[in-house]
Amino acid sequence: MYKRQSKHSPVPKSLAYVEGELFEQYLHDMKIAQRFAGLNRQAMMDTIVKGMGFHVIEQFTTIHNYIDVDNMILRKGSVSAQTGERLLIPINMRDGSLLCTGKGNPDWNFSAPHGAGRLMSRSAAKEAFTVSEFKKQMAGIYTTSVGRSTLDECPMAYKGMDDIVGNIEPAVTVDAIIKPIYNFKAGDED
């Protein structure tokens, strides 16, 4: 649609948008993709729970980089943090994740950050750190994922937990810190 109208449109491509029937079709297709992703996450969890013989006490999902069509909020780099909503904010492979409850803060667009945030780009991290440094940082956590292809995900490439916890208080209550005992991240050679 954009290419057909681009010759006559005063809107730059980087600011192009859809409306009307095209917008409705986009939302329809996006909902299908989001539903598929949710079912895929559930299938993975069901397999792990069954294989490990776990008993599920509480279950919820946290997604990022999506359109919340119920509230018409575009979340890029953020997750929903409605009042009372359970959510997870991952920090890094070493330090784990924050288990939180949303406060529904309108000043934060009823959202929270979807993670710690990078201190540097993926390519910069691969140049700045070594696999040896990465292995040392992951001491005490079982992982087969430390290697050159996952160096961009090393803990040193992300902001620290204290930086995040100290800044998200208006959006969420931090209920617990989940520390990893096992970590898996697919890489190029996996």
Protein language model regions, located:
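Domain-length cofactor-binding catalytic modules of enzymes
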Residues: 3-190
